[in-house]
Amino acid sequence: MSELGVAVGQKIELADGSGRTAFVRYVGETAFAPGTWVGIELDEPSGKNDGSVQGERYFNCEMGYGMFVRPTTFNVIAQPPPPPPPSTFRRSVTTRPTSLNASTTRRPAPVDSGLAKRMSLNAPSPSPGPRPSRTSSTSITRSPTRSPTKQLATASSSGNPSRSGTPSTTTKPAGPTTRTRPSLSTSRHSMGPPPTPTTRTTRKPSVSSVGTRPSIGATRPVGGRASMSARSSTNRLSDPRESTGSVSSVGKSGFKRGSASPRSSDEELSASPVPASPVHQKTAALEKLTAPGAGNGGGGASPGATSPNLKATTITPRSSITNTATMNKEIEDLKAKLKVLEKKRMEDREKLNSLEKVKAERDKFERIIQTLQIKYQPQQQEIQDLKRQLKEAENRLYNVEELQAEHDTAMELATLDREMAEETAEVLKVELDALKQKNEELELEVEVLREENSEFTNGMSPEERASTGWLQMERNNERLREALIRLRDITQQQEEELKDQIKSMEEDLREFETIKEQHTTAKEKLAQTEAIVEDLREQLNNALGAEEIIESLTEQTMNQSEEIKELRAVIDDLESLKEINDELEINHVQNEKEMQEEIDLKDSIIAEQFRQANLQRESLEDMEYTLSRFRELVTSLQSDLEDMRASHAVTENESEQLNSRSRAMLDLNMKLQISASKAQVKTIDLELRRMEAQEAEQHLEIVKLFLPDTYQSDRDSVLALLRFKRLAFKANLLNGFIKERVNGQPHPGHEDDIFDGCDAIDKLTWVSAMCDRFVNAISHCSLEQFSRYEGALYELEPVERALNGWIDGLRRDDLKEKQCADELKRTIALMTHLGEVHISNDLESFADDVHMKALLMQSHLESAAISVNSLKAMVQRVIPSSGEDDELAQYFSKRAEAVVSQTRSAKVIAGKTVRALEDLKTRSLSLTPDTLEAFEQSETATRDLANMARQIGLDLHAFLHEEGRTEPYNYMEVQSCIQRSAQASSPTASSPESDLFNTYLSYLRNATSTISDLASLASDLAQTQEFDRTPAPWILRSAELKAAKTVAPDINDELRRLRDDIAEARRSIAVREEMLSTAQVKIETLESRMRDANAKAARIVDLEADLQAAKKEAAQLQEDMEKQDRELKALESDRDKWKKIASESRVVVADGSGVGVDNKASAERAVATAREMDALKKEIEALQAAVRYLREDSRRARLKEQGDYEWLAEPLVKKKPSVQEQRKQLVKKEGKAVLGELVKLVSSAKVFDLGSLPEKAEDRLKWRPAKTTPGWWVAKQMEDWEALKEWEGSVKGRVRELGGVPGSKKAEREEEAKRMVRRTAAAKLQIRLPGMEGKVGHGGGGGSGRRVQIVGSREWESLQGRLAVVV
């Protein structure tokens, strides 16, 4: 389908194989991608948009039905209704350049300012009316890689829209077209004479009628210079394909006039003249003057087709350029001013965007503040509830304190009563001890009296009884009787007093029971208060959580306030410097922009001059070669003339030939002079451009001094980008020269250089494509990724050094292709590593990757074709055709040509894939990542093909140039050698093929099928995904710097409002903190009171235990008193008995002494009494012995057997120990553990072995583990000792809290009780022994105050014996 026959309303069918049909709704240029696009409306919802792309609408349709495609991706199946024929249909053919220039003014309806500017610059004269549709050279040369057959088919199909896309058979095919890319300003000088019109509307391309030049490279700079003139309005450098696409769009717009509807905007634009401003008029005039130079470069293809008029037009533009230098300067100044205004407008837009961002941030902060206020409301309500609860708790605590005070007073009264009861009990105990002592004394005296009476009565005569001793004894008895009566009265009185005290103590106990009940109630209340306190603590914890939030908010507000202060200071500084900085900034920006524009212009000039210098160098070499040939010819002709004149045998024909040769010599001399003049002009231009390049370089060095310091951080990354571009250019340069050497005439015997050159071409293609990938990745990466490219600058230095060395080798004609290919392997490894490190795995990089693989496939196939062609020429040179091998030679030639043609066909398919991928990249589309495996397989297959072809060629070269061989070669040996090489280079082949190149062709067919699949896949838009192109990092950096300089105008109001909010929040937080601190103090006071109450409760428990012990002791004392009463009654009865006996004996004595009673009866009574006394003595001795035995047995059982029966004293159901006892047990166990740890620490302590330290001072400074150093050893032991001391201190503190501190009364009593238990004494008595006069002291006597320790029965008997002996 031709691109020039597309019109709105046509029905088309997509060429992707899906069979989808659609209607054309829009044709023209778009803003989202360069070139001409066709907007279509599909019949099914398989599209991508609704007629709008990136916010700009081109036509209207439903969502999912619209799509934009290239004009080459569909076929027209139906035409819209034909428009009425215009009156000015047929025009003169001589106005063709005007129509071409007028066609450049056609644009789509939505035109921005940049497009309008380009329209005005490129269209100096509008077209007065429509022209008949016809083809031109611009439509044919749209793509540099398009074949001439396809271009001719496109041209023929555009002439008749009703025909299909197949080429016409009547159209005469043009010759091979040159690869010129004329710009929009091409005039009639570049086209040659117009062809003669035929009966059909189709015409031959004007460019194709001109003879072709033998060198393709000579025509390349023409398109480059032409595209430069078209691109100077936009001030940017692009690929030559872009300019070609713009030319093709112009051709399409020109041919659309005949088929578009009358209502289209394009026809309106072509019918109405476009007004031109003075600047545009000057630009148009300049383009008219400069156009013939570009046209001449493109039109003069061969020396034979050059006319004198054309020669004149090649010199005229140079003089016109020099005459219009001032006009050009003026135009450049106006363009610079326009660019400055555009940049200012962009800055204004950026400022507006920053203002919108600040407004969005303000709204965001307002929303945050509102949310915080909403969050604060429940917290404030909760704090008020907590305050109310805290007040209630304080009231309850106040009531509890009052109750506690009442309980304290009650406890103090109970304590006083208890102390009084204790004092009373002690007094009673002392009195009881005194009574016991008196009782014992009385018992002893009674026994002594009994013994004295028995002794006195034994053998005493009545006279003796009547003596003074008896009377004294009677008096003593009287005293004793009185003492006993007095003692009885005292004991009765004491008993009454004790009973009264017991009654009072019982009353105290009853009162204590009531106090105990009150204590239990107080405990319950205390538990309730503790629960309330726990609730309050939980509430306080919740409040503390809110406090943490408040603190975090406070910190944020403080940080924001600091930032606000800093910003305010910065704002003040900026405002103070604003007036001064405005003019400086404007001047600086103006200078920077102008310098940047000059830099860009100089860079483009340098590139163009370098390209032209290369072309001039090539042309000079060609001219020198031609000159040398001409000189040789002149010398040969002169020698021939001399010979002919000397021989005098010149005939008439020979004279005519001589004349013709002389004329040819004169023509050649004229051509040599013309070429010499051209070379001189080119040399002058080259020197001028070199001077301009040096000037641009110096200007760049000056401009660098004005760049800001921030450029230094990205300098290496920028240099890395430029180095990648240099490497790509140098690799392409080497590739081109090596390809020329490979395609040239090979030197006999050195065909292996061609094969090595093919290998080097493939590797250089890889390097160039990889550098292009890096350039694209750097141009669309983020700032962070851009900063990471600075290391690549130094890593690529050896690569550039190697490329420079090979370029020097090319200059010296000393390039070693094999060495270059081997060294490129290291370069490929290095750049592969860099790609893995830096290139990201996104869709854009994937698109670059598959494009690179497609380029490598194309290069591999081209190398394979060149290798096969070279080996064919080598075999034909070495083995001349003879009669026998004629058929084999022809067969070999046909097979080789078939291999080359099929390889080149596969290369054409690969080129189609490359173009499709490039088209997708321009539309920001990429294939899906799942297609990577297919591309890798295809690339591997083509690489294997190229390697196989090179290996076959190298093996054949080694075989055909074998030293010492004298036998002639034949084609059978060549065939066997090719089969061996193919088998060796493809180990996967099953068996050697019988025919030539069968293995290669099988591999080639597989590769061709895969490449065809890839080509169809690349043209299928359903298999693509769209990706976003991020702006260049230097644009992002400049925007960031500009944003950092701009300050929002309403920032002061925002700061002031935020400052007021922060101050208000700070005041509220201070009030809350004060309230919380007051509550914390109150809580601590309550906790201290609770601790005091707990201590008092523990004291009450101790007092209760002491009271129970006192009760038990009082009961024991009461039992002892009752026992003493019984014993006293028994003693009194014995006393009465003895008194009765004494009175009877006194009566007997009185009767015997005075009256003379019967002596016999008294004697018998005395004898009976004596017997009775003896029996009583014996009984007393037996009883004493029994008592001694029982005492000894009791002491033995108490000391030895009592421990075995202690379990009997334990209760069957053990009482649960109190909390205090449990704590004591725990503290005791912990104390034992502390002691064990102390013993373990002492036993495990070791002295550090200083012998393990290194002897040398150098070794001591080396690193070694910290555990091997003596400092760590000592610190570890000190740490263990401090931890043990801290543990010991904590245990001691708990012992003090539990009341077990040595030195307290309770501890002393317990210790005393333990000592009393441990003592081995049987009894401790206080006995008042009689003195020397036989009297018993009552205190203060000579026998009082002595203490005797009685351990056993023997001591007691000896004491009794001493008493008897003393008495």
UniProtKB/Swiss-Prot annotation:
Q: Does the keyword Ribosomal protein apply?
A: no
User: What keywords appear on the UniProt entry?
Assistant: Coiled coil, Cytoplasm, Cytoskeleton, Dynein, Microtubule
Name any one Pfam family assigned in the record: CAP_GLY
Which biological process terms from the Gene Ontology are attached to this UniProt entry? establishment of mitotic spindle orientation; nuclear migration involved in conjugation with cellular fusion
What's a GO cellular component annotated to this UniProt protein?
A: cell tip
Q: What is its main location?
A: cytoplasm
Quaternary context: Large macromolecular complex of at least 10 components; p150(glued) binds directly to microtubules and to cytoplasmic dynein.
Family assignment from sequence similarity: Belongs to the dynactin 150 kDa subunit family.
What does this gene product do? Required for the cytoplasmic dynein-driven retrograde movement of vesicles and organelles along microtubules. Dynein-dynactin interaction is a key component of the mechanism of axonal transport of vesicles and organelles.
This chain belongs to which protein, by name? Dynactin, 150 kDa isoform
Biological classification of the source = Eukaryota, Fungi, Dikarya, Ascomycota, Pezizomycotina
